[in-house]
Amino acid sequence: MDNKMRLEFLAKSENEGFARVSVSAFIAQLDPTIEELTDIKTAVSEAVTNAIIHGYECDESKVVIIEASICEDEISITVEDNGIGIENLEEAREPLYTSKPELERSGMGFTVMETFMDSLEVYSEKDKGTKIIMKKKMNT
């Protein structure tokens, strides 16, 4: 492993931007293209938003954890919550599926993450939380 960071913050929607910028600053050492940077920022934004809205149901007292690591030319980003978990992971990963239909922009989070990253793994257990691991090779 070349480098690693860990960040913990309260599940407040205003911290989503902070998380995105922090990961961007961390990966700057790889000299990413604007497109790579935008892809990663978007994926991080979706993962953090999912943790806040779905995992913790907007309970701002809870904590979201982000870990990012660089190994050669690959970035690995983990976003984790200890929230309610995802009951049906397969269904949740379907485009346009949402557990919150009343929200304006919902149902595309996992699809966006899969589109912008090279790989996406999701681990979740009901009432224990969700861990999302995203990877992307840089400068390809």
Swiss-Prot record:
Its EC number is 2.7.11.1. One of its GO terms (biological process) is negative regulation of sporulation resulting in formation of a cellular spore. SUPFAM superfamilies: ATPase domain of HSP90 chaperone/DNA topoisomerase II/histidine kinase. It catalyses: L-seryl-[protein] + ATP = O-phospho-L-seryl-[protein] + ADP + H(+); L-threonyl-[protein] + ATP = O-phospho-L-threonyl-[protein] + ADP + H(+). The keyword Protein transport does not apply. InterPro entries: Anti-sigma-factor_SerPK (IPR050267), Anti-sigma_F (IPR010194), HATPase_C_sf (IPR036890). One of its GO terms (molecular function) is protein serine/threonine kinase activity. Keywords: ATP-binding, Kinase, Nucleotide-binding, Serine/threonine-protein kinase, Sporulation, Transferase. It is an enzyme of class 2 (transferase). SMART domains: HATPase_c (SM00387). The keyword Nucleotide-binding applies. It comes from the Bacteria. CDD domains: HATPase_SpoIIAB-like. Pfam families: HATPase_c_2. Binds to sigma F and blocks its ability to form an RNA polymerase holoenzyme (E-sigma F). Phosphorylates SpoIIAA on a serine residue. This phosphorylation may enable SpoIIAA to act as an anti-anti-sigma factor that counteracts SpoIIAB and thus releases sigma F from inhibition. Belongs to the anti-sigma-factor family. HAMAP family: Anti_sigma_F. This is Anti-sigma F factor.
